[in-house]
Amino acid sequence: MIYLASKSPRRAELLKKINVEFLLLEAEIEENLVLEGSPAFNAEKLAKEKCSQGIKNAIATNLENYPVLAADTIVVMGNKIYGKPKSSDHAFTMLSELSGQVHEVITGVSVGAWDSEKADIATTVSYTHLRAHETN
């Protein structure tokens, strides 16, 4: 059993696909990108903050001591950093800009327990061209 410190339906779906038992854990943080260091630094920093907040919330609410998994993904194309879309229209605009372009998808991952935490980052992808109906 683990706690997932994320509101991402995709992260929950991925854990279900690999048969990991998990409980969702509240881990609200200010998700503003810090414009210091690399995008990878930012993704890792946000993942660590989510994990730490999740652990604090679990302790404060007397939950059992299970590992906490948190992640944050940042997309980078050229000099532009894409954060979370603010609406479905914003998501459509972002996907349209990325469609057919090579860009980086950087995910910071943090796993922690009451007394320790580990974080890492990974991945570059090539994106195929998307048709308008595929982004809806």
Segments predicted by a language model, with ranges:
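Short beta-strand and adjoining strand-loop segment in the mid-core
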Residues: K80-G83, S110, A122-Y127
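Ordered, amphipathic secondary-structure segments that act as subunit-interaction surfaces
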Residues: P67-T73
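Active-site-adjacent loop/tail segments of enzyme domains
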Residues: N42, T73-H103
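Short acidic-glycine loop/turn motifs at beta-strand connectors
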Residues: M77-G78, A113-E117
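N-terminal polybasic phosphate/anion-binding patch
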Residues: M1-P67, K80-I81
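Residue-level signal for inorganic ion chemistry
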Residues: L15, A47, D72, A91, ...
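Short, structured loop/turn "capping" segments at alpha-beta junctions
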Residues: Q101-I106, S116-I121
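Single conserved hydrophobic/aromatic residue that forms the stacking wall/gate
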Residues: H129-N136
